[in-house]
Amino acid sequence: MELTLWTYEGPPHVGAMRIASSMKDIHYVLHAPQGDTYADLLFTMIERRGQRPPVTYTTFQARDLGGDTAELVKKNIKEAVERFKPKTLLVGESCTAELIQDQPGALAKGMGFDMPIVNLELPAYSKKENWGASETFYQLTRTLLKEKVSSSEKISPLRWKELGRRPKVNILGPSLLGFRCRDDVIEIQRILSEQGIDTNVVAPLGASPDDIERLIDAEINICLYPEIAEASCEWLKRNFGMEYTNTIPIGIKNTIEFINEVHKKLDLPLTNKEELENKSKLPWYSKSVDSNYLTGKRVFIFGDGTHAIAAAKIAKEELGFEVVGLGTYSREMARQVRATAKDLNVEALITNNYLEVEDAMKKAAPELVLGTQMERHSAKRLGIPCSVISTPMHVQDVPARYSPQMGWEGANVIFDDWVHPLMMGLEEHLIDMFKHDFEFVDGHQSHLGHTATNTNNILNSDEKKEKNSKEGIIWTESGRAELTKVPFFVRGKVKTNTEKYAILRGIPEISDETLYDAKAYFN
């Protein structure tokens, strides 16, 4: 067991709650102690939903452990069914209740209800939230469609031609507490509609059990979030022959690849690449004169597998950044992240320990961090601009406005979200350089956070460190003055490299000339 004050993913029953809360006419009975009801806050506070999740807790207490907790489970299941009248019932247990081994799913199936009951056996001590969401969606899909497996023929992607209608697809994977899922679905539906393709079902977000049974009315599946939907897509392919897409449409290049992949599977004519590129402003902005200073900016990326991989591709191929760190907390996506990192000549960081991520971030000395809510905190401590690209997220990352990550509009949003922190960083540096002019005063409002950046504190802390420099090296007045002209977000790396150079050359005092020589040496 590991004690920590932050975790990237909750236990698997939180993933099950995400699926239940995303859908209609479904109820989830969770065998759990009173303390596990905290998960409600994730949906009412973070997602800002107007209703509680469709979850009934057995909420057993310490005194109940001396009696028959199985009867408590049956009582809560009966009351939930009578009150909420769901079309499908999910039954599971939290990490604490797993130790009691009451087997609530088996109890529910023995109560004689006339509805599908999905028994969720989620190993709380070896799996995490995304796996729990994936397994829940998979078990739900399997339960509701298993009777149609033997009687159904394999579905051809070209069936729409035989039926004389427009092709239909399912969009699978979006859920509550996913990153911008609501807006991504709207954007992808719009793109598909422009291509003459209809959306059959979106699941689990907004779907009902009846919609799950209609999945086989479509020709192919769009696997929008592999962490949630890939297992279900594989099962549908294995049992019904339904093909599914592998390209995630985040960024211009991936969106074009996604459209072409869908067209190939449905035997539709391929579209003109240049015509598609003009649908977003990102390609032109990233090629414009104003964006030249972005080229080569060092970026550190950490998040869920889907968004981290997509961010790395956009950063490298579409914005001209240098990716100096790439990682994920999603062990299910570790192989794909490692492959992407290898292509970028960096070592992948696979961990759920935020301190390891912060340490790697510090060593990489990036000029921009793309990560989760925790990386935003870490970057703020290190004085590095940051943009959130992945869950876990704060309520401020669930905007009321339309703000997708996928498709053409998603590319526009990404450009704004990633580039603006860098622009603000440049502005901060200019103010730092000219702070002695009468127009500027210390304590001005910083764009890097809600508190001002006191440049004197930064310089003073640097001076204190200089007293303890490696091998007794001393910074002269000219050296310190020149160091202050270096942008604050790379000042630490420049200082470290200059000291390394001085040690290598046996230089006891670092002047402005030494700093210039070190820069030439490392470049």
Swiss-Prot record:
Binds 1 [4Fe-4S] cluster per heterodimer. The cluster is bound at the heterodimer interface by residues from both subunits. Substrate binds at G425, L426. The active site is at D290. [4Fe-4S] cluster binds at D36. Residues 451-470 are annotated as: Disordered. The gene is chlB. InterPro entries: ChlB/BchB/BchZ, LI-POR_suB-like_C, Nase/OxRdtase_comp1, P-CP_red_C, Protochl_reductB, Protochlorophyllide_Rdtase. One of its GO terms (biological process) is photosynthesis, dark reaction. Belongs to the ChlB/BchB/BchZ family. Residues 461-470 have a biased composition (Basic and acidic residues). The lineage of its organism: Bacteria, Bacillati, Cyanobacteriota, Cyanophyceae, Synechococcales. Its cofactor is [4Fe-4S] cluster. Its EC number is 1.3.7.7. It comes from the Bacteria. It catalyses: chlorophyllide a + oxidized 2[4Fe-4S]-[ferredoxin] + 2 ADP + 2 phosphate = protochlorophyllide a + reduced 2[4Fe-4S]-[ferredoxin] + 2 ATP + 2 H2O. Keywords: 4Fe-4S, ATP-binding, Chlorophyll biosynthesis, Iron, Iron-sulfur, Metal-binding, Nucleotide-binding, Oxidoreductase, Photosynthesis. One of its GO terms (molecular function) is ATP binding. This is Light-independent protochlorophyllide reductase subunit B.
